[in-house]
């Protein structure tokens, strides 16, 4: 482990340990990231000069008001497959004006399974000639390509990749859609999945999951419970979760297209939802003992926190220590922290991913 990586990780450990000390958690479990090639996503501007074009990012000056263009020829934090593809793709784009004209951004979405989706974003309308050139490029480089411009989306192959993780003595396949959120650090994501499954060990009754996304945690957690009800509001994520459940041949998960707030209303009988009836979901048929939550950065709303306090076990994955801290002030009135983890999902940044298991007092 290099000193620069160790220093940034230790700073996060110190910060989290101090911030959460009032909840008297057990010893912090720390899950490190690879030091390089850990990001499965990368986005670059394309900078055009009179006789050249290159990948670029912007560096803000001290006052934050001005930005300097930084040429990017390699990107060590991105997956090796992205780094290998970058010069090959750029050479092909430069050689074909149909593909390079008014191109202003290139996004990469890679997987451990070997699939790659490249999104080319333009400041011009894309025509049939562009589509033919993009098809030839996709075939030559063995990648999927998507072209975007204002009000236009052209898909060459698929607008998604399929990731595959080995976990709990089996393989899990995940559809990851170009425009939807996925965990960017696949190696740390696998560690998070394993930790969540370990936290669920010995759980009884059924599992409720809020904010399930594409079913990232839902699939492996389903092996630990007799029945699982997962909720998610975004339609594209719900469709991806349902595809993932079917592809992985798992038969004990139902997905409800509800927000956390809406689920609380439905569970407490305050409101009926046609979406539940259409999906043939009877919330009252579940006997929940554990709830799993992986909320957005804003954390969990007050009504949902009250709902969580009724569960025997709460497994909470957080991408924002500050909102986790605020939420724990409420949850530790009824529960105690019995597992505490830090996942270095975003090395070399101030961002921290953490996990807690809370059990009823």
From Swiss-Prot:
It catalyses: uridine(54) in tRNA + S-adenosyl-L-methionine = 5-methyluridine(54) in tRNA + S-adenosyl-L-homocysteine + H(+); uridine(341) in tmRNA + S-adenosyl-L-methionine = 5-methyluridine(341) in tmRNA + S-adenosyl-L-homocysteine + H(+). GO terms for molecular function: rRNA binding; tRNA (uracil(54)-C5)-methyltransferase activity, S-adenosyl methionine-dependent; tRNA binding. Keywords: Methyltransferase, S-adenosyl-L-methionine, Transferase, tRNA processing. Transmembrane segments: none annotated. It holds the Pfam family tRNA_U5-meth_tr. It is an enzyme of class 2 (transferase). The active site is at 319 (nucleophile), 353 (proton acceptor). InterPro entries: MeTrfase_TrmA_AS, MeTrfase_TrmA_CS, SAM-dependent_MTases_sf, TrmA_MeTrfase, U5_MeTrfase_fam. S-adenosyl-L-methionine binds at residues 183, 211, 216, 232, 294. CDD domains: AdoMet_MTases. Its EC number is 2.1.1.-, 2.1.1.35. GO terms for cellular component: cytosol. GO terms for biological process: tRNA methylation. Belongs to the class I-like SAM-binding methyltransferase superfamily. RNA M5U methyltransferase family. TrmA subfamily. Dual-specificity methyltransferase that catalyzes the formation of 5-methyluridine at position 54 (m5U54) in all tRNAs, and that of position 341 (m5U341) in tmRNA (transfer-mRNA). This is tRNA/tmRNA (uracil-C(5))-methyltransferase. The gene is trmA.
């Amino acid at each position: 482990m290099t000193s620069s990586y160790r220093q940034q990780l230790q700073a996060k450990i110190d910060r989290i340990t101090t911030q959460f000390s009032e909840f008297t958690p057990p010893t912090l479990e720390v899950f490190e990231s690879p030091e390089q090639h850990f990001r499965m996503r990368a986005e670059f501007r394309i900078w055009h000069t009179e006789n050249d074009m290159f990948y670029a990012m912007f560096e803000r000056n001290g006052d934050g008001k001005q930005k300097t263009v930084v040429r990017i020829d390699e990107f060590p934090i991105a997956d090796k497959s992205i780094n290998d593809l970058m010069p090959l793709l750029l050479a092909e784009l430069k050689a074909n004006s149909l593909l390079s004209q008014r191109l202003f951004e290139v996004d990469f979405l890679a997987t451990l399974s070997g699939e790659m989706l490249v999104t080319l974003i333009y400041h011009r309308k894309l025509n049939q000639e562009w589509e033919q050139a993009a098809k030839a490029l996709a075939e030559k480089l063995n990648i999927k390509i998507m072209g975007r411009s204002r009000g236009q989306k052209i898909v060459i192959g698929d607008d998604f990749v399929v990731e595959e993780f080995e976990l709990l003595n089996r393989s899990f396949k995940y559809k990851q859609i170009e425009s939807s959120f996925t965990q960017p650090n696949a190696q740390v994501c696998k560690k998070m999945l394993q930790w969540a499954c370990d936290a669920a060990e010995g759980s009884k009754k059924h599992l409720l999951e809020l904010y399930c996304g594409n079913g990232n945690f839902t699939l492996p957690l389903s092996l630990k419970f007799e029945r699982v009800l997962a909720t998610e509001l975004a339609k594209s994520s719900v469709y991806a979760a349902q595809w993932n459940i079917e592809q992985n041949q798992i038969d004990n998960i139902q997905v409800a297209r509800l927000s956390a707030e809406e689920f609380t209303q439905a569970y407490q009988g305050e409101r009926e939802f046609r979406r539940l009836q259409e999906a043939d979901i009877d919330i009252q048929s579940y006997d929940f003992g554990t709830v799993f939550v992986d909320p957005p950065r804003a954390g969990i709303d007050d009504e949902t926190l009250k709902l969580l306090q009724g569960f025997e076990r709460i497994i909470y994955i957080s991408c924002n220590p500050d909102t986790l801290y605020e939420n724990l002030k409420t949850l530790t009135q009824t529960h105690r922290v019995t597992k505490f983890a830090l996942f270095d999902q975003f090395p070399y940044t101030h961002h921290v991913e953490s996990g807690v298991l809370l059990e009823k007092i």
